[in-house]
A protein has these predicted regions:
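Interface amphipathic segments
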Residues: 1-242
Length: 242
């Protein structure tokens, strides 16, 4: 079976640097080079029986010149990427991996627009994840955070986001509107694991959509799902529809 095309386009991958230590404390410091650029690594793998840690991985992965567009076909929307990732994860004896990831995307090209300083962070366990993303761009600021916990019928999902002064025309995402400017707040809060037992709400707050020369404002739009089995209810509340 052939490898996926993006993997083939990586070409020959070389590692230059140093791998040293013992199996319970192995250090990989160096550079991975491929046809699309290089990634610097400063990682420690190991275990600590005294602290009941079966395995751990921590360290840093970074790149200053990754040519993502070369992985895909012609006219793909990607360009270059620069990033810095820190990871700290461990697995206790008889347990599962958990840890934390912090990432700063210093530059990321998409549709010929260069995004800068995208910050992401996340904590993960076997059945849960929580994280945040912050994009502070002159043509739109986004802050979002969310948590997901898988617990069968009691699974939990909570997501909040705030988008301010989003200019999709300047980001080369659309040319259908003249000088569009979008702001909104979103909250989703649910429990359940399928459409039959899902309970919670989605709330869209203070949606502002301005163009030249018109504008639209929606103070609130909320959808609430409640009840079980045959007693399901769906309630919609908004400025324009109830």
């Amino acid at each position: 079976k052939s490898l996926p095309a993006p993997v083939v386009k990586l070409g020959t991958i070389n590692f230059t640097g140093e791998i040293s230590g013992f199996f319970d404390n192995l250090v990989a410091f160096g550079k991975l080079s491929s046809s699309i650029g290089s990634i610097q690594t400063d990682l420690i793998f190991g275990s600590n029986k005294d602290k009941n840690i079966a395995a751990y991985l921590r360290g840093r992965i970074a790149s200053s010149n990754l040519q993502l567009h070369e992985l895909f076909g012609e006219n793909n929307p990607f360009g270059e990427a620069r990033f810095d990732i820190n990871i700290d994860t461990r697995r206790p004896v008889g347990g599962n991996f958990s840890g934390n990831i912090q990432a700063q995307v210093k530059e990321f090209d998409y549709k010929a627009y260069k995004y800068k300083d995208i910050n992401l962070s996340g904590n993960f366990k076997k059945s849960s994840f929580d994280g945040t993303i912050h994009v502070n761009d002159p043509n739109g600021e986004l802050y979002a955070q969310g948590i997901f916990q898988h617990q069968g019928q009691n699974s939990l999902f909570n997501f909040t986001a705030r988008l301010d002064h989003f200019r999709p025309d300047r980001l080369n995402l659309t040319d259908k509107y003249e000088a569009p400017n979008i702001s909104l707040a979103l909250n989703a809060d649910f429990t359940g694991d399928n459409i039959d037992n899902l309970e919670g709400s989605i709330t869209l707050d203070s949606l502002s959509f301005e163009t030249t020369p018109s504008s639209f404002f929606l103070k609130k739009f909320e959808v609430v799902a409640s009840g079980h089995s045959l007693d399901r209810q769906l309630t919609i509340t908004s400025d324009i529809l109830n």
